[in-house]
């Protein structure tokens, strides 16, 4: 149970005195204040107890007893809050989860990049086309994608739309994951379809057959555990817009501590992780599990300072380092971070984000990623942990459940010339359903080789 936001206003707002990167410039501060006041009265989207449960699951990841699968859109869009989109995304994550659980013989913690991922940090504040300069698109929670002045003006009313879109998404996710749709046998049947129709299916056929035998064996023994019928699924997003996140921060009536009830887990991005800035300050005040994206410029000293600021009690499950180095850098840059952090005695979860360091512009002008680069970064991540005797804790991917053509390569090979066919992302290129499942089978093989 959570109590009214008003009691927490001062404790959760210490970030306001510090510089905050990547915040929209709203033309009417009064309108923003009115929206924030309204959001403060809204009910929580998630409960503190669920955040605690995820923290316990992440503790298992940090200790090497579980694996994190975190995935979803680069940026969600308001017009994609449909049952089909959400179901397909969930279906893809559940299929990946089933493969990883079986092949790695390890519990898989399933966290969606979903129900709140409506904002994007950008490298430039403006965009120029044909001599016209407008504010850059920062995600549906801030402004419109269309390139015209009216659409691009940041509008605080969109924060309420983000709340409502997140609420309806979460409602569907909760219904799907507890209402029989996530039944393991159903998920396995979808995987069998994939193996039959995928060009790289032969590789995975043996694994699918093993899972089939295991399920048949259990059925023959008369075992039909309740756990097969539902799935634990958590929501996460980047905590970027601090006005929104702090408006949805509440005091937990059980403990008197602050929780950001906009999602179970939030992370701080590569562009907003300055130690003396507002985002880290905000994250230090809430009890949710926290992720931090670490790019190739991160030093071991910085990593240790994040632990000091965000996990002073050294609590496994509290802090996750999501590493996004690029396939060409991960083997050089990651070892020192892992060594120094491990030597400090902190137990953090190490997760690879093989997407963000591997983006390039195709000749066609599309932003894309090579499936082989994504795979190579995951391989490098596993190699580093194997060499150091530490635990590769999980994978953070941008994916969709639809058959889009945004990343090149994969079993159903997509070529640069195919990108225009279904390039639908609002921001960065995502793995499609088939590429995501390819990745799950390949990661499962890597995990087995550990």
For each of these PLM feature ranges, what is it?
Residues 63, 262, 285-287, 344-346, ...:
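Short, well-ordered loop/turn elements at secondary-structure boundaries
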Residues 120-124, 193-196, 332-334, 360-364, ...:
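Short acidic, glycine/serine/threonine-rich loops at helix termini
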Residues 64-65, 350-352:
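Short coil-to-beta-strand
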Residues 303-306, 318-350, 356-404:
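Non-transmembrane, aqueous-exposed alpha-helical and coiled segments at domain scale
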Residues 69-74, 111-114, 352-355, 398-400:
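Short loop/turn segments at strand-loop or loop-helix junctions that form parts
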Residues 58-61, 99-101, 282-283, 384-388:
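A general structural signal for short secondary-structure junctions and capping/turn motifs
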């Amino acid at each position: 149970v959570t109590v009214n936001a008003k009691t927490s206003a001062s404790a959760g707002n210490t970030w306001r005195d510090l510089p905050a990167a990547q915040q929209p410039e709203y033309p009417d501060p009064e309108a923003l204040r009115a929206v924030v006041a309204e959001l403060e009265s809204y009910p929580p989207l998630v409960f503190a107890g669920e955040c605690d449960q995820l923290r316990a699951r992440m503790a298992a990841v940090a200790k090497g007893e579980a694996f994190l699968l975190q995935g979803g859109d680069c940026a969600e869009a308001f017009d994609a809050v449909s049952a089909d989109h959400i179901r397909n995304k969930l279906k893809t994550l559940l299929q990946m989860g089933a493969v990883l659980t079986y092949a790695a013989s390890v519990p898989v913690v399933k966290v969606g990049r979903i129900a709140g991922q409506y904002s994007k940090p950008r490298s430039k504040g403006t965009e120029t086309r044909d001599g016209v300069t407008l504010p850059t698109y920062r995600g549906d929670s801030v402004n419109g994608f269309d390139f015209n002045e009216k659409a691009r003006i940041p509008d605080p009313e969109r924060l309420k739309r983000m709340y409502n879109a997140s609420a309806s998404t979460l409602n569907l996710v909760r219904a799907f994951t507890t209402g029989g749709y996530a039944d393991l046998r159903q998920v396995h049947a979808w995987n069998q379809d994939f193996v039959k129709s995928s060009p790289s299916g032969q590789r995975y056929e043996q694994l699918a057959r093993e899972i089939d035998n295991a399920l048949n064996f259990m059925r023959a023994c008369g075992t039909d555990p309740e756990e097969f019928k539902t799935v634990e699924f958590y929501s996460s997003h980047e905590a970027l817009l601090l006005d929104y996140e702090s408006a949805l921060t509440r005091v937990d009536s059980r403990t008197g501590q602050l929780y950001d009830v906009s999602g179970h887990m939030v992370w701080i991005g590569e562009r907003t992780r300055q130690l003396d800035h507002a985002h880290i300050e905000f994250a230090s005040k809430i009890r949710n599990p926290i992720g931090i994206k670490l790019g190739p410029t991160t030093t071991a000293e910085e990593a240790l300072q994040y632990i000091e600021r965000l996990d002073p009690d050294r609590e496994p499950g509290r802090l996750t380092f999501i590493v996004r180095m690029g396939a060409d850098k991960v083997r050089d840059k990651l070892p020192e971070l892992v060594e120094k952090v491990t030597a400090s005695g902190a137990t953090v979860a190490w997760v690879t984000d093989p997407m963000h360091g591997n983006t390039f512009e195709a000749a066609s002008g599309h932003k894309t990623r090579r499936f082989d680069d994504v795979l190579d970064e995951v391989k490098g991540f596993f190699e580093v942990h194997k060499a150091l005797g530490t635990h590769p804790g999980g994978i953070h991917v941008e994916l969709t459940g639809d058959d889009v053509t945004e990343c090149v390569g994969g079993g159903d090979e997509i070529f640069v010339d195919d990108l225009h066919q279904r390039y639908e992302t609002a921001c960065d290129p995502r793995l499609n359903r088939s590429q995501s499942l390819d990745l799950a089978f390949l990661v499962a093989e890597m995990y087995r080789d550990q």
